[in-house]
Amino acid sequence: MKLHCEVEVISRHLPALGLRNRGKGVRAVLSLCQQTSRSQPPVRAFLLISTLKDKRGTRYELRENIEQFFTKFVDEGKATVRLKEPPVDICLSKAISSSLKGFLSAMRLAHRGCNVDTPVSTLTPVKTSEFENFKTKMVITSKKDYPLSKNFPYSLEHLQTSYCGLVRVDMRMLCLKSLRKLDLSHNHIKKLPATIGDLIHLQELNLNDNHLESFSVALCHSTLQKSLRSLDLSKNKIKALPVQFCQLQELKNLKLDDNELIQFPCKIGQLINLRFLSAARNKLPFLPSEFRNLSLEYLDLFGNTFEQPKVLPVIKLQAPLTLLESSARTILHNRIPYGSHIIPFHLCQDLDTAKICVCGRFCLNSFIQGTTTMNLHSVAHTVVLVDNLGGTEAPIISYFCSLGCYVNSSDMLK
């Protein structure tokens, strides 16, 4: 039975001698071994720690020799085993949590002198090939180098597979639970599987130059909400992003250049951590009202088909308000939870896409819509010119929930 992880062996005598441990783990293969003998059955179990420099490894007897297990962070792939003799703490990290739990269970049995129900190894040196699983970065930039029959190393944190002609995301990639950066640029991928959202540590996702036409709602509801920091969707065929896209609130860098975008998500202002936004060479006619809420360091909207602000507003006021409109406003104003298990799905969609008045209230189908220009420097420190004439202004939509709000805010439309 073996476990691949990082190991640090700390002597508990060091503090008494005024010494400090170096504080850094090394990549190792841990083996649960038994010493075999022809005359008697194997009864002694050992923990063998092998590293790339010491393939024969260092062994520690386990039977009645474990003082304590520290497993508070076992779900994060971390644990510590304290031995009696020698007086050392074996600190384990960067392990697959399920494998670590099984390995620790086997060590407990060995400590008690019980039979281990899983296969155990003999005391033999570890092969160099086993350390290939510790690679944290792999870059593949051609079809001929792409592995067809061999799995990706489980410990990968950075994987790039560009110019490989991929038409779909390889399911083997979705088993890399330590992955932090995934670069699938310059392929032919048309659709993203929802299981990408299971990569709980994924911080950077590069899908530049593919054939994507959409970004799924399932990904917006996944663990990417808490992990994803950078997303590159440039050079695809995306026309619109779902309103749920704005739930990816950890995003800091978003690239949407060279798509077919006709609008931003209406709630884009909810991306409170967004600092770099690039959406050059799309088909944006105007910006949504919540665009004003962004606080960017860099903004590039060059080459979009921005329209001139309309002189006359679009009036869609209802008098009196319908029951649907009144109920929707009440639900949103009071932040009452809703979902498809409570109300029909199409009503959930209506609530998700509700407009926000300049006064902060919500409106569904009863509103006044006006368009004005906004200097992009009001939301970004650095602004790329929006056209060849040196402009830094773009049209932005404003909504008003009532005639009173429109009259009181009419100066902003001049």
Curated annotation (Swiss-Prot):
Q: In which pathway does it act?
A: Protein modification; protein ubiquitination
For this protein, the record's InterPro entries field holds: Leu-rich_rpt, Leu-rich_rpt_4, Leu-rich_rpt_typical-subtyp, LRR_dom_sf, LRR_domain-containing
- Please provide one cellular component term from the Gene Ontology annotations of this protein: cytosol
Q: Which organism is it from?
A: Homo sapiens
Repeat LRR: residue ranges? 155-176, 178-199, 201-222, 227-248, 250-271, 273-294, 295-316
Q: Which domain of life is it from?
A: Eukaryota
Give a brief account of the tissues where this protein occurs: Ubiquitous. Maximal expression was seen in the heart and skeletal muscle and minimal expression seen in the kidney.
Q: What is its main location?
A: nucleus
State the PANTHER family in the record: LEUCINE-RICH REPEAT PROTEIN 1, PTHR48051
Protein name according to UniProt: Leucine-rich repeat protein 1
Q: Does the keyword Transferase apply?
A: no
| Lineage of the species this protein comes from | Eukaryota, Metazoa, Chordata, Craniata, Vertebrata
Q: SUPFAM superfamilies recorded for this chain?
A: L domain-like (SSF52058)
Q: Which UniProt keywords apply?
A: Leucine-rich repeat, Nucleus, Repeat, Ubl conjugation pathway
Q: A Pfam family this protein belongs to?
A: PH_LRR1
The record's subcellular locations are: Nucleus
What PROSITE patterns does the entry give?
LRR
Q: What does the function comment of this entry state?
A: Substrate recognition subunit of an ECS (Elongin BC-CUL2/5-SOCS-box protein) E3 ubiquitin-protein ligase complex which mediates the ubiquitination and subsequent proteasomal degradation of target proteins. ECS(LRR1) ubiquitinates MCM7 and promotes CMG replisome disassembly by VCP and chromatin extraction during S-phase. May negatively regulate the 4-1BB-mediated signaling cascades which result in the activation of NK-kappaB and JNK1.
- Whom does it interact with, and what assembly results? Component of the probable ECS(LRR1) E3 ubiquitin-protein ligase complex which contains CUL2, RBX1, Elongin BC complex and LRR1. Interacts with CUL2, RBX1, ELOB and ELOC.
A GO biological process of this protein is:
intracellular signal transduction
